[in-house]
Amino acid sequence: MFFLLALLTELGRLQAHVGSEGIFLHVTVPRKILSNDSEVSERKMIYIITIDGQPYTLHLRKQSFLPQNFLVYTYNEAGSLHSESPYFMMHCHYQGYAAEFPNSFVTLSICSGLRGFLQFENVSYGIEPLESSARFEHIIYQMKNNDPNVSILAENYSHIWQKDQSYKVPLNSQKKNLSKLLPQYLEIYIIVEKALYDYMGSEMMAVTQKIVQVIGLVNTMFTQFRLTVTLSSLELWSNENQISTSGDADDILQRFLAWKRDYLILRPHDIAYLLVYRKHPKYVGATFPGTICNESYDAGIAMYPDAIDLEGFSVIIAQLLGLNVGLTYDDITQCFCLRATCIMNHEAMSARGIKIFSNCSMHDYRYFVSKFEAKCLQKLSNLQPLHQNQPVCGNGILESNEECDCGNKKECQFKKCCDYNTCKLKGSVKCGSGPCCTSKCELSIVGTPCRKSVDPECDFTEYCNGTSSDCVPDTYALNGHLCKLGTAYCYNGQCQTTDNQCAKIFGKGAQGAPFACFKEVNSLHETSENCGFKNSQPLPCERKDVLCGKLACVQPHKNAYKSDIQYTVYSYIQDHVCVSIATGSSMRSDGTDNAYVADGTMCGPEMYCVNKTCRKVHLTGYNCNTTTKCKGKGICNNFGNCQCFPGHKPPDCKFQFGSPGGSIDDGNFQKSDEFYTEKGYNAHWNNWFILSFYIVLPFFIIFTIVIFKRNEIRKLCNRENTELIHPLYQKAMMWNINIAQNFRSK
């Protein structure tokens, strides 16, 4: 009788506080398979559970998404902020799969019993401990959402991103044009408003447990991108909301963005989300797509409808974060997910079973991070050592236990080298995927270009290193290096000038405007002219920051600007027609607003723009001096090493006859006391031979012609002399003969 009462109480709690429409299936006692290796057993675990009488073997691997400094913030009745560190929750999160269903995902917390999700091909289960049980009993229930019947995103925020689709690429584009996905980390700061706090249990640890569970599932989804979603901290508005949460999602977003700028400035995060409970919301969220690293727009609102459970809510957050990192919603006629629901599908929040990102999402993300480097995602992780997750064969990413991964059947370009079903190499081939793998399944030789330079002064070509089928990480000049004859600075691999920025927006011929235009445009208290926002109000630039606020351009033709810019502002100042665009009317794909001067643009002697302020240039991040470290024969790159000029050998740019230059980071370097690389040495000897041949040959031809002409002239002169002397010689001979004859006659 007591057991039945406890079971009914537990089901009532699930129904009331999780929003689940789950169907109770079974009570199970999970059985842990012990390992003799204590270190391995801490990283990997195996549990056996039963669902409806059928045993399932869960292979789990430790999942790290809570940083060491993770805190939970709450407010007391007096409005004072307090923080706690739930340290016990930080080391008990795992993800994996069920051996009986290889195409499955399992995300569990084992802090106090097993709690989490089991996603099979077309069904999802939730598992939670039966807290009143003394026999480690758990309940397993089938997850089932009602259709929330709400729109995905507020229109006036989704359209901002759609005006600039330059980041989109055709689905049949070559993978070799996309850089390899390196491990990246996205820090999300979560705030739970009062209504959702009450809906989830109205108790700090219970709500914290549910939010951590949701982010754990979101992190599992993003492992496809090698992107770890970390919950930097959690804030609970347990007594009262700090801002009004009335109105639609887009209205709340504006208020939240203003509040965030004032109160979260010292708390580390890449993006902050406010989670709001709304029984029947018009939209499930609002955010600024493609703005993950833009401090002016790094926020979002996620609505929790009454009709969904924690799994469905995790999909909503994953979709919103997907928009932040450059994804778009899937076109079901072109995008597919093998035996799974596509996360960026509009129906995903109510679907059951395993969910993955589609081929379209993979292309969107790979292109976004390769062309518009999301620098904030490339920081060092503050996590405990993150153990490798289960590899996903066919996602185009070479992961642990994979010999190759050329994508799915449609994408794979190395079918004779790599088995796209098993991600194993065929036969004795050397490689089966990557830009440094040849069509003959061999590694490209050292020095083969694999990523071309996109800026002649600030970005460098990368080469295959001869040991990997992947291209080395991108190398470029350290931020602050002078370019364009000392009139501009390199920043994130580009020579940043207002002329280049204006030409990209308004077309060929457009240039950066004179100072008078910048001064006028950035000194007014209007929504279209400002140096950022504070409390949702436009912020005029200080005089020192005038050249770092709104971008001002001049152009030769009035209507020369590109058609995708719909909001253009004209000003007539000191005989100049100054042109700018309204804030938010055109977003760069790296998350910054085209309306503003790009970071790294020169704003004075040894000064450049950073986040709309003019700052002193510092070659930050590394102790690299071109004069001492590179001996004046190279420049510093983004890894703090010397990028040597041709004829000088890295790492310290010593003179080396025949060296192509470069750095130890660009892939074309091979340690040797004598030569840079055999290929580079031989190649440059060949180049010198060819160059010498083409230099000497013309001189040889000219010399031969001169000698030939000189001989011709000499012969001609001799013939002329002979012709002049010969008649006189004949007369002299005749005279001598006549004398002789006369002498004889006498």
From Swiss-Prot:
Protein name: Disintegrin and metalloproteinase domain-containing protein 18
Membrane topology field: Single-pass type I membrane protein
Gene coding for it: ADAM18
Main function: Sperm surface membrane protein that may be involved in spermatogenesis and fertilization. This is a non catalytic metalloprotease-like protein.
Organism annotation: Macaca fascicularis
Superkingdom of origin: Eukaryota
UniProt cross-references to Gene3D superfamilies, sorted A to Z: Collagenase (Catalytic Domain) (3.40.390.10), Disintegrin domain (4.10.70.10)
Keyword Signal: yes
Chain ranges passing through the membrane: 688-708
Glycosylation site residues: N36, N122, N149, N156, N177, N294, N359, N465, N611, N625
Covalent S-S links between cysteines: C293-C376, C335-C360, C337-C342, C450-C471, C624-C636, C630-C642, C644-C653
Annotated keywords: Developmental protein, Differentiation, Disulfide bond, EGF-like domain, Glycoprotein, Membrane, Signal, Spermatogenesis, Transmembrane, Transmembrane helix
GO cellular component, one term: plasma membrane
The organism's taxonomic lineage, starting at the top: Eukaryota, Metazoa, Chordata, Craniata, Vertebrata
Residues annotated as domain Disintegrin: 390-479
Recorded domain comment: A tripeptide motif (ECD) within disintegrin-like domain could be involved in the binding to egg integrin receptor and thus could mediate sperm/egg binding.
Expression sites (tissue/organ): Expressed predominantly in adult and prepubertal testis.
A GO molecular-function annotation: metalloendopeptidase activity
Domain EGF-like: 620-654
GO terms of biological process kind: binding of sperm to zona pellucida; cell adhesion; cell differentiation; male gonad development; proteolysis; spermatogenesis
Pfam family, one: Reprolysin
